[in-house]
Regions:
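Active-site beta-strand termini and strand-to-loop segments that position acidic
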Residues: 19-22
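Short beta-strand/turn micro-motifs at beta-sheet edges
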Residues: 12, 81, 192-196
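Catalytic-site microenvironment of enzymes
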Residues: 6, 54, 58, 426
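Short glycine- and acidic-rich boundary segments immediately preceding or forming the N-terminal edge
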Residues: 1-15
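C-terminal accessory segments enriched in acidic
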Residues: 145-154, 162-426
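Conserved beta-strand scaffold positions in the cores of enzyme catalytic domains, especially
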Residues: 3, 17, 72, 121, ...
Length: 426
């Protein structure tokens, strides 16, 4: 493994290029050009560990490293990664800078590509977890694209090779996550590195890490990246990708923004003096900690109404349920501190979602390791469902809470669930 600095970020952080393999076919991989997209970065280090191991897979390593020369930039945007943000410290999206090359990070990548002249490139990203593979409940766990290199979306040998490699990876991944692989729209954008590299003769493949149920940290998706890339390397080494039929690319489902974190169907809501049944979609957004080293979540109502052809990671059929506001429990700070998770759960079952201290002002912002929210208000201002409102309410049957929605997380009150990632202080 050879490591070289190919440039520095806006704030002087090293951008490193690692090389391994002695083969004739050069392959370039780069990750985290968007600083808050790190799933593939982890997978690249899994690959480094794999290639430096000594076990029953030595023949596979010999095949790949003897056939390919791998050039890897695991973190193109270290400033963005440090602050967990998409853009660099000039506030420019590096992946929209392939033409102007204003960013030092973009210049470093372009310079490397021109210097080594790879045959194949892998552009590694994360996408929202709310994309589906088609208009169904299959999450788009990984999405692919063989970018166009011109506005007519022409297909030459360079783009054909990228498409065939996608089909090779899709074939392998369908055995692990059937139905959960999608493809991106291929509208040409000359600002993007993938489109530009394709036009430069580098067969470029975009891989986007999306969502998978009960994998919020994308650790399973990390493994799928590793698996997909390893299969691609073998196919490149053995040139088996040439057997793929281009027509099969059209059979891969389109990427579709049609998921919610929580979808509640047919719930009864009272609003503006009217009682009606409708559907309610909730999404959870990330909140960066002050040190950029921790993450909290903010669950809000994104949709009310007809949600045709949309689905949720968690779904509740609420045709017998009514949305009801949570009550506020008054207690001293010391009493709140002494509450066990099961005691908090019992208060929620009794209809409480908030605690107000009677002897002081409680903190605002995300609260971890608690179930009940804190409030400094005399009354609960969340009395019904509104677009953009934080998702803090009960679903009740005949006046008895059946589910609690706490900051966009669903608690089935028939079960002893005693944790959510975070609630809030108001």
């Amino acid at each position: 493994l050879i490591s070289k600095e190919i440039g520095q970020s806006v704030n002087g952080r090293s951008i490193n290029h690692l090389m391994l393999g002695t083969g004739k076919t050069k392959v370039l991989l780069w990750s985290q050009m968007h600083g808050d997209e790190s799933t593939a970065t982890m997978a690249l280090f899994d690959l480094f560990n794999f290639f430096h191991a000594d076990d029953e897979h030595n023949d596979l390593r010999k095949l790949i490293l003897g056939s390919l020369e791998l050039h890897i930039v695991p973190m193109l945007n270290p400033d963005g990664a440090q602050q967990w943000k998409r853009r660099n410290d000039l506030e420019i999206d590096i992946n929209r800078d392939a033409r102007m090359l204003v960013t030092p990070e973009g210049r470093a990548l372009m310079s490397l590509a021109k210097k080594i002249q790879p045959v194949i490139g892998f552009n590694l990203h994360d996408q929202s977890t709310l994309y589906a593979a088609g208009r169904n409940d299959n999450t788009a766990t990984l999405s692919f694209l063989a970018p166009a290199y011109d506005y007519p979306k022409s297909m030459n040998e360079v783009r054909k090779r990228a498409t065939q490699l996608i089909l090779t990876m899709n074939e392998a991944l369908q055995t692990k996550v059937p139905g959960k692989i999608a493809k991106y729209d291929d509208a040409f954008d000359p600002r993007c590195f993938g489109d530009t590299f394709q036009g430069m003769g580098i067969s470029t493949i975009l891989i986007e890490s999306g969502g998978f149920y009960a994998d919020p940290e994308k650790q399973y998706i990390r493994k799928l990246n590793f698996y997909a890339l390893l299969n691609a390397f073998v196919s490149i080494a053995e040139k088996t990708y040439v057997n793929q039929n281009l027509a099969d690319y059209e059979k891969i489902s389109e990427n579709s923004r049609s998921l919610y974190d929580v979808l509640i169907r047919n719930v009864s809501i009272s609003k503006e003096g009217i009682q009606f049944r409708t559907n309610l979609g909730i999404v959870r957004s990330q909140i960066k900690g002050p040190d950029f080293g921790s993450m909290s979540y903010n669950g809000r109502i994104e949709e009310l109404g007809d949600v045709e052809l949309t689905h949720g990671y968690d779904e509740i059929e609420a045709s017998s349920l009514t949305l009801t506001p949570g009550n506020i429990k008054l207690m001293r700070k010391s009493e709140w501190e002494a509450l066990s998770p099961l005691q908090e759960l019992e208060l929620i079952r009794a209809g409480y979602l908030f605690v107000k201290w009677t002897d002081g002002t409680s903190p605002s912002g995300p609260l971890k390791a608690r179930l009940l929210n804190l409030t400094n208000k005399e009354t609960n201002t969340i009395q019904t469902a509104s677009i953009g409102q934080q998702a803090q309410f009960l679903l009740s049957r005949d006046g008895k809470p059946v589910y609690a929605v706490l900051n966009g997380y669903v608690l089935d009150l028939t079960k002893d669930v005693t944790s959510v990632p975070n609630v809030f202080g108001y």
